[in-house]
Amino acid sequence: RLCSSDLTEYNSKQLHIVGLFIKKENYSDITEIMAESQKLKEESNKLLVKNLAKDGYILDYDEIKSSTVDGFVNRANIAAALMQKGYVSSVKEAFQTLLMSKFGYYVPPKRPSSLYIIERLKGFGSISVLAHPFLNMNEDELREFLPKAKACGLNATEAYYSLFDKAETELAEKICDEYGLLKSGGSDFHGATKPDISLGVGKGNLAIPTEIYKNLANCYHNFRL
């Protein structure tokens, strides 16, 4: 079973920490953590819509929310609404202009600490993974983060990812070996917000060996002994 805390923070950078093999008795704990994160995220999104309206970019937050599958609004939904209203020509343009924090409309929500989430997952007896490590960190920042994360219980880092090129994959593999971390992988499937990625199928020639899962599963079972 898998549960993820997709948005955590370290040194003001957004990191994605994934929890694997969450036990049923910990579902309520995870739900509580995620509910608080979602509350802060919604407050940020509502403020974003309010700030946009001040400069004439009028959006209906309730309408955006009702258009989502699960009732959770993210910036991709707001970007799509801006495009539908004709304020931008594409979702990409929205993210590169109005939705960037430097424009002043978007105020990032407070997020749980990455190290805190890793410690909680360790306390649950679950496996923690740093997903797509180069998304918001360069190599030096990653190397600064990993020793602290491993001390808190980090088990693995994603080495196989849809948007990694060959050099990034090889670097991620090397770093995993250097820090004694397991390798993980994923397509980064996010439903309708990433329509070009299917469940379990990434972009390009992404292929994740079954051995990757087996190593993670063995780590989980050994941890429980």
Q: Which ranges hold each PLM region?
A:
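A metal-dependent hydrolase metal-coordination microenvironment
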Residues: 1-74, 152, 157-194
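Active-site gating loops and adjacent loop-to-helix segments of metal-dependent hydrolytic enzymes
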Residues: 7-42, 61, 80-103, 198-223
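Non-catalytic, well-ordered alpha-helical scaffold segments
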Residues: 46, 76-80, 115
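Catalytic beta/alpha-barrel core
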Residues: 104-111, 158-162
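Conserved, well-ordered alpha-helix/loop/beta-strand core segments that scaffold catalytic motifs
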Residues: 107-137, 141-150
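Short amphipathic alpha-helical segments and helix-helix/interface helices
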Residues: 118, 146, 169-173, 213
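Active-site-proximal helix-loop elements at catalytic-domain edges
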Residues: 142-160, 218-225
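Short low-complexity, flexible loop/linker segments enriched in glycine and/or proline
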Residues: 143-146, 172-175, 198-202
